């Protein structure tokens, strides 16, 4: 694991995690937490903008193999936790499986790893081999738009990381543009999620705690030439 | 303005803004940025889960007075920028104006202030007085669910702030619960957005740069007692 992180010890130093740290505050519900395990999580919500949204979501869940991740849903969102590549694989596949021609749909998500408020449980880390939905994701060539906001936490010198993430988007032909509070990209569903996976992989190399917030949408009716 | 922030100078020290800093990197599009102005922004997307989503969104935009903020929309999201209370007022009113009985709808947003990659333009800061949609927001008593993830950036000692934000939710009767990567709350549309406004006000007192990511939804078909 990366520097500064041991189980059940508050993350000292320059961390500024906002998802609820305070591991040494006994009055807060996340008191005493922390994990050494390489758990990546993605909390996300799927929004098909159609009267038929329930069956689209349930249908997509049926087709998606989420056996390589731990999962929990509530009335607001679902969270997958486990090895990063399998978490991204499952989210990408769910989105691809929910795609329906002509239906405008978005997925809003946050990928998080290394939060000092995290726990060692609620995860699956025992799987190996090819991601179970790899073929589905590979076939997801439908065009999509996306935006991302990346928070590398707890490090002073993060500019090179941010630059790498920008250049990676350029190299991948995702046409990044800078907008207030985010970076916008465009590409296929497959290429965008592959990029998110690689952004996360980059972050793992240099920061112990990061959060990537993203939106991806398809079949938008908005005509931006207007 | 708060410590460490002057125009066009990179934020030194422990900042770990991920929305694209690197003000001294001439190869990046946000080179040379920074602002002293008290601009708060909210980038958000509205998701009515119905075939009728376009007319719901356009209808809500028609009814919402966004004259106290600067605004720009694209195919993914809209951003409002200006004084915090007016930004939150406009977003809350848009959501309240879009509410339709029986229609499941969500709004996903990020409130941001103090990013060293920010600019002084694209904002309205000249307005005073009562927020233009105050009556609409006050009347928004419909029940809603929400989650929030708060990132106070650039400070070492933020735990007290996070604790205050948690306790504030308890005091307001919003029944906060800790979930992976976020805090969940429930209350009326009005009370939830009032809370978001107050969280942002708290953050302004102690950190120069924060981001609050949130989701709010209404009329969810999910039965959590199952």
Task: Give names to the regions the model predicted.
Chain A
Residues 3-226:
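Charge-rich, low-complexity N-terminal segments
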């Amino acid at each position: 694991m990366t520097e500064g992180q041991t189980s059940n010890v508050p993350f000292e130093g320059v961390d500024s995690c906002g998802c609820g740290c305070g591991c040494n505050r006994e009055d807060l519900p996340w008191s005493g937490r922390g994990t050494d395990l390489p758990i990546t999580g993605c909390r996300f919500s799927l929004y098909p903008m159609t009267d038929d949204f329930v069956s689209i979501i349930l249908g997509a869940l049926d087709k998606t193999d989420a056996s390589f991740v731990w999962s929990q849903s509530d009335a607001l969102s679902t969270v997958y936790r486990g090895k990063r590549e399998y978490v991204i694989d499952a989210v990408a596949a769910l989105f691809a499986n929910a795609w329906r021609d002509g239906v405008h749909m978005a997925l809003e998500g946050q990928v998080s790893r290394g939060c000092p408020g995290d726990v060692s449980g609620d995860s699956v880390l025992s799987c190996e081999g090819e991601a179970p939905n790899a073929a589905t994701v590979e076939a997801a060539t439908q065009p999509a738009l996306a935006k991302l906001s990346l928070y590398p936490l707890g490090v002073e010198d993060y500019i090179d990381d941010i630059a790498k993430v920008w250049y990676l988007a350029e190299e991948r032909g995702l046409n990044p543009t800078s907008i207030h509070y985010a970076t916008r990209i465009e590409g296929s569903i497959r290429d965008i999620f592959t990029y998110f996976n690689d952004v996360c992989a980059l972050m793992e190399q240099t920061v112990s705690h990061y959060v990537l917030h993203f939106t991806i949408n398809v079949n938008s009716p908005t005509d931006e030439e207007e």
